[in-house]
Amino acid sequence: MSIYLDNGATSYPKAPGVGEAMLDYVNNVGANVNRSTYATASTAAMILLDTREQLCRLFNFDDPTHVIFTPGMTAGLNMLLKGYLKAGDHVIVSSMEHNAMMRPLIQLEKEGVEFSRIPADRDGIARAEDILPLIRPNTKLVAVMHASNVCGSLLPVKEIGAICRERNIPFILDAAQTAGHYPIDFKELGLSALCAPGHKGLLGPQGIGVMLMDHEFAKSVEPLIAGGTGSASDSEELPPYMPDRFESGTMNIPGVYGLNAALTYILEKGVDHFRAHEEKLTQRFLDGLKDIPVRLAGTEDMAKRVGVIAVDFTGHDNAEAAFALEQMGILTRCGLHCAPSAHKTLGTFPQGVVRFSLGYASTEADVDGALEAIRSIAR
């Protein structure tokens, strides 16, 4: 019997009904959307529309036509960053970012785009006011993650959004570790765009992601991918209207069906339900670590974190610790988590950490089992 504590990588198990919904599409529907008008094609199109509307409800977003399906979180960020930024532009990120943000920016840097990082402290906590000295006349974008995939620390995105609004700077949110886990209000945060994967806190399958863009920002983003949309087929130009402009090619419809089932479950339960559950388990985990000779990388303040817990087995090799945990049935992720800048900020580079990430299906028994295993390795 294993204990799955790698929900920061992907959720498991998926929400009830996800597999069945995907199988229903494959076995009983099978049609593409925007290509034909027969019954099964219309059925699939209605599921896509319903899923866009579900995402509007989840994130308090107004327009389902500006909800874009992507292959995943990384694809969404690439579409936004590479479609918006140009040579001479400056963008502000944080020192906690994942490589899904940083690698596109490193590529763009070679083309004349500059970036600065909001510094976080050794607990992964950043202050919104530290963005102010970084703003330049050519600052065209602020793009940050909502919560660290390494240590779970939350960035002060509401305050950052307010600063961006005051200065008319577009603001992009990477919600990879918070969508489905933590309440997100597109309007309240003053977002220009939001990206999220379908397979983490949204409890859907891999291979499907979402990108929400407000009307003004969408007009400034050039599509990264061009091709067939099933619409405006008399022209070799991309259609000017949404969502078609950003959805060239064949849609991952099985993925959307799975995501639709997952969102139905999340909306029925409410995000606050999942947040409360993970807060309770995270606090239990943090309390249990206090008498074990390991280092917690990240804050103990539950108001400033999510259920991603980074443990440094000081005096031990973290990779060996992760292997020992696996032998005891505790499934985690060890290493640098595609976020070297975050580890440098936390003081855990290059050794990395062992990451325990909780999910909706995690239990107190899972937490206690993990703590017992950590204790046996660390002593």
Segments and roles (model prediction):
Residues 1-379:
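Pyridoxal 5′-phosphate
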